[in-house]
């Protein structure tokens, strides 16, 4: 795929990130090696790529289940279902990508195991803990302190907060190249001293998970203004202004078209109201309105 055709898929203001993504693809394609991104990409990027791109497998990882921000790998078929020599050459930490001493002809199921266990994306999961007995700490406190180190947001994944007795901990995957810098330089969150440790991510079952409030909404259609109006309990007339001023994002991109039809699985961020996922289509009412299960991130 030519670079100009690739970049055309994404908003102009995201051309820098799109170019870096294309560079990873180009390296993987030209040299028949795996190409990783250092950056974590939002859904407006990885949704467009799908599972394959121009003969390469596209594998994403954001550490957490259902993560929004994900690093992306472009993987040639030879690394998943090639010949015995390729598997043996790619052996990592004493492990070969051969099952039962035989080539893998049908690698559909193997691809999942390959993704999770056979190579490590260039990220580390940090646990940042502070004493929370004397005030409430929010996402913005953790992110503000991290970005205060002049770290770009795209080099960090999703942030999940967990209350742990007298402490609150922020779990966040970061690009491997900035891990040591954060551990060395991040001394506090707000005015609270912090402790930082690297968490082993091999056991996905012990990792923190997102918390949601579920809400079943009924709307005339999946138009953006209709959904935002129902979520916020504001009239459709009143939600037009924040939409047109760029205060509503769909999959992390400002959306100023109030008539846009929003798909199930999309993320809607409404400044001042929070972030929501259109999770499940629950069918229609007797009057023909649409019922949608919406999950609000908490």
Roles of regions detected by a PLM:
Residues 242-243, 262:
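Short, well-ordered loop/turn sites that connect or cap secondary structure elements
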Residues 245-253:
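Short, structured beta-strand/loop micro-motifs enriched in basic residues and often containing a Trp
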Residues 228-229, 235, 247, 264:
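Internal, well-folded beta-alpha domain core
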Residues 1-225, 231, 254, 261, ...:
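Ferredoxin-like alpha/beta domains used as RNA- or RNAP-binding modules
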């Amino acid at each position: 795929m030519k670079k100009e055709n690739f970049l055309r898929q994404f908003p102009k203001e995201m051309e820098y990130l799109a170019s870096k993504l294309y560079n990873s693809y180009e390296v993987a394609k030209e040299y028949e090696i795996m190409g990783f991104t250092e950056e974590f990409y939002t859904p407006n990027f990885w949704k467009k790529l799908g599972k394959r791109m121009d003969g390469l497998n596209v594998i994403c990882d954001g550490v957490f289940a259902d993560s929004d921000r994900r690093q992306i790998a472009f993987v040639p078929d030879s690394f998943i279902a090639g010949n015995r020599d390729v598997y043996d050459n790619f052996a990592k930490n004493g492990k070969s990508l051969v099952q039962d001493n035989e080539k893998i002809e049908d690698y559909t199921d193997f691809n999942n195991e390959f993704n999770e266990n056979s190579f490590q994306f260039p990220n580390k999961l940090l646990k940042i803990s502070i004493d929370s007995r004397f005030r409430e700490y929010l996402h913005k406190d953790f992110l503000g302190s991290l970005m205060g180190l002049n770290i770009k947001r795209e080099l960090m994944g999703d942030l999940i907060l967990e209350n742990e007795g007298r402490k609150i901990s922020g779990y966040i995957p970061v690009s491997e190249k900035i891990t040591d810098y954060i551990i060395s330089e991040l001394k506090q969150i707000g005015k609270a001293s912090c402790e930082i440790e690297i968490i082993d991510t091999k056991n996905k079952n012990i990792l923190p998970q997102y918390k949601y409030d579920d809400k079943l909404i009924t709307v005339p259609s999946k138009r953006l203004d209709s959904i935002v109006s129902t979520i916020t309990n504001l009239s459709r007339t009143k939600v037009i202004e924040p939409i047109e001023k760029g205060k509503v994002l769909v999959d992390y991109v400002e959306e100023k078209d109030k008539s846009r039809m929003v798909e199930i699985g999309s993320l809607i961020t409404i400044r001042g109201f929070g972030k929501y996922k259109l999770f499940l289509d629950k069918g229609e009412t007797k009057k023909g309105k649409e019922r949608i299960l919406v999950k609000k991130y908490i």
